Amino acid sequence: MVTTPLHSSPKSSLKSSTTSLRSVHTQSGRMGPSEPKHRTTKSWSIWGGNDEEEPELSNKNKGKETAQDNSQENDNVSNEGTRLHDNQQTTILKETTRIEKGEKDKKDRNAAIVEKNTRPRAWPFFWGRNKKDPEPTHNIPTDADNNTLSRLANSLNPAPLTNTYIPYKPDAILIRDKGVKTAKKLTDDIGNQFPNIVVPSFDILPKQTIWNTVTSTIWKWKTEYWDRRPSSRVREGEEQVQHSQNQLKEETNTVANEAKDEERLEHNRGSLFRVDPWKKINLLSDYQSRPIRVLIVGVHGFFPTKIIRPFIGEPTGTSTKFVTEAEEIVKEYFDQHKVPIEISKIALEREGEIFDRVDFFYEVMKHWSKEINNSDFIYFVSHSQGCPVTIMLLAKLIKNGIINLDNSQFFNDEIQFCSSKKIISVLAMAGINNGPFYGADQTLFVRAYQTIEKDSLRELFEFQKFDSKQSQSFIEGLRTIISNNVKITFVGSINDQLVPLYSSTCLFANHPNIFRAIFIDRGSQTPAFITRIVKIAGSLLNLGYNDHGIIKEISGSLAGTLTGGGHSTIYNEKQVYHLGIKFALETTDLSEMYPIEYSPYKLSELGANPYRLPWCMRGLMYESNKHFSNEEIKMLFKEFEEWEPETKQLKDIKNRLNGLKYRL
């Protein structure tokens, strides 16, 4: 009986299995009954395979195999051949899997090496570089200029997140990519941003005309003449008039003079005029001969400890957040006018007490004095406690000569010549300029929190005292920066749970270089009547007139809930950042700077007398009829009649103003 050769099935299996191994050649010998335990030996590597080939039996030897008559031996040989066939297939599959995995790993490593050498890296700004990432390599051109090398150095060594100067780069890292920006825009179209309002609008300021220019000049001459006149008491002493009739006339003149002084003071306080932005854009860009260099500085506010954050919310208002939002609005503003700009950023971050923060930020800014002085437009954006910090910091920088406002008078090899002065704008959002709500330090919640963070929280209430060290430094800072033509935009939140409107809008200081606005979130559900009141009052204040203290009286009743978010939603509104830019670039400058006017008041008396609010409303309506159209008062009456307050505080306001029903 002739035994069937066992090499046919293993050979066909080897042929089909080894086709996937391009770099490996496997040869299998014939398995005879005399060598049942023989196996092929292989050695593998990730670069290929080396076979130790067994000598193949010649066909001549194959033909010499003889048949055996024993059927039991045939069965044993067949079973042994089947087992060898299965073992070979299993071995080949394992070897194939290992080879394919090795080749894949090799390709991945090669691709990573190529990518490392060729692909430029752009590190994310918010988190920095991952420690697991390989160091980037770049081909630095030998003929590159200084600007190219500087930008390349910035890409190789990205600047830290905070307390450093982030220079301009064409692919600005703070701007969101197109995908994220588009998603944000869609969210705005259906979300809470567009319905939000900021009152009063910038358009409340009068537009500059020939008539109001001449009128302002006449009033200026009249004021100068009035100031040169000797006082009535001096004239009386010179004339030595002593009888009672002259004394009575003197008293009458005193009352008349006080009324005239108030009228003259209101006109002197006045307001700036709206002008075309191209007037200042041309000056900043040397008549469009170069890009405008813009520097944005962000200063965050008070950060509570983690224990208290579940009650008042997480502190999302970081300096980086403000700088990012402001940069986007600045780009949009200048893109509308098709003006090239170069934006640099400094995000100042440090927690602690106010004076410690001012000193620390001063050292940071002093280190970048050259870059700061090469800027044409400097935009400070601040929030909460960061507002007084920003004003004190800017005043210190100007006093000590770190910021030079006029590069046409002082310039050198490092500081470039500029034909115009710098324009500096300060945006103060929900600033604690006059402290938190009066009496909040006596609440159980705040008293319990003072045990955790005593000094940082206690000094916020020091701003409620006009004779405190913090308030005096703040007032001195205001005087310094306004005398150097810095323009300040105070914006308060209607339902702020921490800062009242009279504090966030800084009502104790008056000057044409100050613009006040109130942010009204759609989620606050502010009644139309309250919105109308703050709009009229804000318009009067921005035009240099008197609101008769109505904002001070109603501020206490507008406090939001502790978790309402009014204090932390203001810095998400684009209109707020846009307002700070427009007030700086689209208004006139005073021909002659005069000091800021301070009007201190007692916070303990605000809202204490229920009869004061109707009197304030009477004065507000009088001023509105005098300076605005009658439509505002008509709408005020209509909205008051339709108003149905829900909270106890708002019901109290309506009860005290019931005289409006009878047009009293």
Swiss-Prot record:
For this protein, the record's SUPFAM superfamilies field holds: alpha/beta-Hydrolases
Q: Which domain of life is it from?
A: Eukaryota
InterPro entries listed in its UniProt record: AB_hydrolase_fold
- Low complexity composition-biased segments: 1-23
Biased composition, class Basic and acidic residues, residue ranges:
57-67, 95-110, 231-241, 248-262
Region Disordered: list its residue ranges.
Answer: 1-146, 231-262
Q: Where is the composition biased (Polar residues)?
A: 68-94
Supply any other comment: Present with 377 molecules/cell in log phase SD medium.
Specify the protein name.
Uncharacterized protein YML020W
Source organism: Saccharomyces cerevisiae (strain ATCC 204508 / S288c) (Baker's yeast)
